[in-house]
């Protein structure tokens, strides 16, 4: 990897999040986390390809520092593919993410606060990040903000999260009506996975609703609702439980003061 390659594609990466450097490099549609900053204890990365990729991919992937040098042994040697074969999830080596391990003592942490790194395929960067502080707490649903939507519309409901969540976890949130029936619709993540948007298949009806969040929802550092990825042995996490965020759909007229 040479600095020439880094400098030659950074503008494209910043604008599009992917590159098409050469014919042998598989076409990348999206890399998650998709934001510009990730925590130093980042646990996983997902890459969506335009089509299925033949052969092992992990040997072709590297993490590069700003000077072009390669970070040594950052990944767990396992390729986790989606059922359609288009999305590859890569795990950062947990023994180097967690503190107090032999691997971390020998090789050091994978990422350091303040540096910039690039994820590369065949030596060409496909995504850059700035490294921020460790994320040591899971998502806090009490801090989420739910947008207002109007009845008789299919207006998207947007939930602003307190932090980014894992890019593969959009389906870990769902909407139920007052009778507990699941509301059918399409969910997606936006704004660097820090917002969840839901568009119902049928128009909203006025009334009470619940946003149900699975206990296994994670942030990019592997922290879950009410628990941390790195938990002391003498302080095990409590039992996992789904979270509920209540909201209501009302017309503008019913909201107006009397």
Give the positions of each predicted feature:
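Detector for methionine-enriched segments
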Residues: 1, 16, 91-92
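Bacterial N-terminal signal peptides that target proteins for export
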Residues: 1-10
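Acidic, low-complexity Ser/Thr/Gly/Pro-rich repeat segments typical of extracellular/periplasmic
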Residues: 22-258
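Bacterial N-terminal signal peptides
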Residues: 9-17
């Amino acid at each position: 990897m040479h600095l020439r390659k880094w400098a030659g594609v950074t503008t494209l990466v910043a604008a599009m999040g992917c590159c098409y450097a050469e014919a042998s490099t598989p076409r990348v549609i999206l890399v998650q986390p998709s934001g510009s900053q990730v925590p130093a204890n980042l646990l996983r990365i997902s890459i969506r390809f335009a089509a299925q990729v033949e052969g092992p991919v992990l040997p072709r992937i590297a993490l590069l520092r700003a000077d072009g040098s390669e970070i040594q042994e950052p990944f767990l040697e396992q390729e986790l593919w989606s059922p359609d074969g288009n999305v590859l999830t890569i795990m950062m080596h947990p023994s180097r993410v967690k503190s107090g391990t032999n691997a971390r003592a020998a090789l050091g942490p994978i990422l350091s606060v303040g540096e910039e790194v690039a994820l590369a395929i065949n030596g060409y960067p496909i995504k850059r990040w700035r490294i921020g502080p460790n994320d040591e707490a899971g998502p806090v649903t009490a801090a989420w903000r739910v947008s207002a939507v109007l009845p008789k519309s299919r207006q998207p409901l947007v939930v602003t999260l307190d932090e980014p969540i894992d890019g593969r976890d959009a389906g870990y949130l769902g909407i139920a009506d007052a009778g507990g029936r699941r509301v059918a619709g399409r969910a997606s993540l936006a704004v660097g996975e820090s917002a969840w948007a839901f568009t119902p298949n049928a128009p909203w009806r006025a009334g009470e609703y619940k946003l149900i969040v699975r206990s296994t929802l994670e942030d990019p550092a592997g922290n879950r609702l009410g628990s941390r990825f790195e938990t002391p042995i003498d302080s095990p996490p409590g039992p996992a439980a789904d979270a509920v965020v209540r909201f209501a759909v009302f017309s503008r007229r019913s909201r107006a003061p009397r």
